[in-house]
Structures are given as structure tokens and as C-alpha cells.
């Protein structure tokens, strides 16, 4: 066997596979080696997690852990592009890991098909060098942040909603804030909108997820030009992005401050007043006497007399599908319009006794009933339990679910 007459900084197979990124200034061989020696944890195998995992796997990350207990559904596919139609019903974390291995068999994948919570997060996170928050709920964001601080792990956090996305790196460097530094208290749960309610375009999560992968590569390569201490805001509608500087680490922060009060994971559902998931919770804001189920409303609308049905959904949802008798008056309009204008829009008069109110899933319709009772007290407003989703499930399975 002939002796080598050259000095190689990287193996022949890696040089061939990763040649285009090896040629990039400030990344090169050292960056590739560092990336190969890095273990990255992705929390959330959805719209953000798919591009993060795909690009990091293709780039040659050493170990890729994926946390997600959910299963692939048809309404995921427009934005969660790692999955295919024949995978509907299968595990997201396993499906995404399989996709990474198909593209790059040299990557070690670890599947955590569990619901992340205070009891298991420390044990899972301790084996990773960088964490990517690709989730869509506030409680999990605080949990991920706190555990990253407690274990001294840099956190790459992304989010996307409708046309917009944002991205930052937390807890990376002495002056870099953590998420809790900026948001010491969680928002009111009723003010939080996720993509299940507000929607999102696939290219938005694709853009933000790709940029999360880029931040991971920069951190792994030990570059100083990360988004630590900065927040990138992306406006997909206008095709614009801007970066703002965040305030420095708060010495009084409850988890990363000089005298932290949080030294272990807490009860984040209690802290945030909301569940650690992106599912829509069914609210109960009204007495049963002012609510009807979809079967009862079906009987009512079968009667000969005219029905008054108020649909509180935004115009984009009303356009997807609605019952023919529905009158579109949004929840915001129920708040802002005066009684006279509401009466005019509804077409009601002094002889009208009942108006039924419907929305997507039965939450906004309850809020609307409470508002309308204050403005038009002579009319009996009744909420339809479960909204159009319940209608589609129990009355007409041809009604478009979304």
C-alpha cells in the first residue's frame, strides 16, 4: 500500500459530499468538523422543524434529536414539507428522522416521541449542544428557555404566523438575554394566536426554519456573527426583513439573573394559564341555557320560519364555507359596532326573539354572545356548541374542515 503524499484536513468522502460548503469563507474544514461533532435537539417536528432538520442533516450535523409526540395529518402537508401523503397518521418525530437518514445516512438521529414537560426536559436536553425551539405555544417556549439556561445550552428560537416570522438566539454569550429576560410574564392566553387559528403560509415557516438551521451552523462553527442579542423580523407580504437589537441580559431575571429564583423546571401550564400544546381548547364561557348543539340547530333551521344566524369568523374563513343563512359579522365588529348598526346588519327587528351565533370551533361565538347580550339585550342570542367543526363532524361531513 502506497503511503500518502498529501495532508488531508478532512476525509475524502466528506470532502466530496460537503465540497460546496467547505469552500465558504469562515466555515470551511473547521466549521464542517465542528458541525459533525455537534449534537442538536429540535423541539417540534412541524413547519419549522422540517426545514431545520432537513438542512442540518444535509449539512452533516453529527447528531440530530427530534422531540414531538404528534402525528402527521393532512392539514400539515402544505407547510411541513418533509412529509408525504402516505405518511398521514404516522409519528412526526420518527418520520422526520427517517427523512434525514434517507438524505444523509451519516447523521445519527435520536427520536423522542414524547410530550416535552418539566419531568423529562432536563434528561433529554442534557445530551445536546444546541437546542432549536420550533414549537407553537407559550408554555413550551418558557420550558425550553429555562432548561437551556439551567444546562447552559444556546437556544435558537423561531416562530411564524400568517405572513410574518421572527428569529433570535437566546442565552449565547455573557450579555445575551434569555427569552424570560425579555418576557418575564406570559401573555394572557386569550390574546395568543397560533397557526391553527391564525393560519400561516408554507414559505414563511420554510424561510424561518432555514434561517434557524443557518444560526445553528454558525454557532457550531463558533462564529461570532449570530443573532444572539438580536431579533430578526421577516415580513413575507412585503418581502422585507429587519433586525433589531434586544436589551442585554437582565441581572434580575428569574432564571438567568444574578440571583435566580428558578433553579429547576416549574409547572409551566400553571405559570402560563394554558396547556403546553398548540391544540385549541374548548372554552365554557356561557350557561348551558344559552347554548344549543348542532343537532338542535339542525332541527331549528328545518322549521319554516326565518332563521337568524350570525357568523363571527373573519372574511377569509367565511369565504371557505358557510351555511346559506349566515350573516358575516366578525367578533371584532361585535365589539366595535353600536347596537343600531348591529341590528341593521343582522336584519332583526322588535319581533325577533332568537339569533344563533356560530364560529369555527365554538369559542369566539361564546365571546360574541356575551358582547351582543350587553348591546341588544332584548334579543336572545344563542351559541352553537362546537361551531362549524362540530357541524362538519356530526351533521354534514361534506362541509369543508380546515
Curated annotation (Swiss-Prot):
Any one annotated GO CC term: cytosol
Binding residue positions for Zn(2+): 178, 181, 253, 256
Enzyme class, spelled out: transferase
GO BP: any one term: Mo-molybdopterin cofactor biosynthetic process
Residues annotated as catalytic: 195 (glycyl thioester intermediate), 359 (cysteine persulfide intermediate)
SMART domains for this protein: RHOD
Reactions this protein catalyses: [molybdopterin-synthase sulfur-carrier protein]-C-terminal Gly-Gly + ATP + H(+) = [molybdopterin-synthase sulfur-carrier protein]-C-terminal Gly-Gly-AMP + diphosphate; [molybdopterin-synthase sulfur-carrier protein]-C-terminal Gly-Gly-AMP + S-sulfanyl-L-cysteinyl-[cysteine desulfurase] + AH2 = [molybdopterin-synthase sulfur-carrier protein]-C-terminal-Gly-aminoethanethioate + L-cysteinyl-[cysteine desulfurase] + A + AMP + 2 H(+)
Cellular compartment(s): Cytoplasm, Cytosol
GO terms, molecular function: ATP binding; metal ion binding; molybdopterin-synthase adenylyltransferase activity; molybdopterin-synthase sulfurtransferase activity; nucleotidyltransferase activity; thiosulfate-cyanide sulfurtransferase activity; URM1 activating enzyme activity
Enzyme Commission number(s) of this protein: 2.7.7.80, 2.8.1.11
HAMAP family (UniProt xref): MOCS3_Uba4 (MF_03049)
Family: In the N-terminal section; belongs to the HesA/MoeB/ThiF family. UBA4 subfamily.
Protein name, per record: Adenylyltransferase and sulfurtransferase MOCS3
